Amino acid sequence: MTSPPTFGLSKSERLYLRDEINTVFGEGKAFVVYPLRVVYRLGSEHRVAYSSMLVSVAKKRFRRAVKRNRVKRLVREAYRLNKHLLNDVLQERQIYATIAFMVVSDELPDFRTVERAMQKSLIRIAGNVPSSALKNE
């Protein structure tokens, strides 16, 4: 039986180490669910949290920092509210995920659009989690 979802977003659930970020972008798989481009990597190396994430918004798309911060806040909030869609599967199969979300839209998206894209992307990643733990990575 899985525990009830926790809706916090702690530091252990954020991807911030340069080596881990390079590994995600170097070895990860990518897909687009508009307005998000998602790059993720699944692994069996033990971490504190089953999934860790980062959000990136290009300065080229949103020149003003206020808008970039708003979009990042929307993506983080959508992830925080829907991460249980992925974490339940990861916890059951003892797999760990690192995920990068990049905004590809040129216009400021609303929360409903971001949340739908987040749900679709987390369900898609959960569908790609292997049934047995990855032993040789």
From Swiss-Prot:
Catalytic activity: Endonucleolytic cleavage of RNA, removing 5'-extranucleotides from tRNA precursor
Alphabetically ordered keywords of this record: Endonuclease, Hydrolase, Nuclease, RNA-binding, tRNA processing
KW GTP-binding (keyword) present: no
Pfam families linked to this entry: Ribonuclease_P
EC class: hydrolase
EC number of this enzyme: 3.1.26.5
Any one GO CC term of the record: ribonuclease P complex
MF annotations from Gene Ontology: 3'-tRNA processing endoribonuclease activity; ribonuclease P activity; tRNA binding
Keyword Ribosomal protein: no
Function description: RNaseP catalyzes the removal of the 5'-leader sequence from pre-tRNA to produce the mature 5'-terminus. It can also cleave other RNA substrates such as 4.5S RNA. The protein component plays an auxiliary but essential role in vivo by binding to the 5'-leader sequence and broadening the substrate specificity of the ribozyme.
HAMAP family in UniProt: RNase_P
Complex formation: Consists of a catalytic RNA component (M1 or rnpB) and a protein subunit.
Entry protein name: Ribonuclease P protein component
Gene name in the database record: rnpA
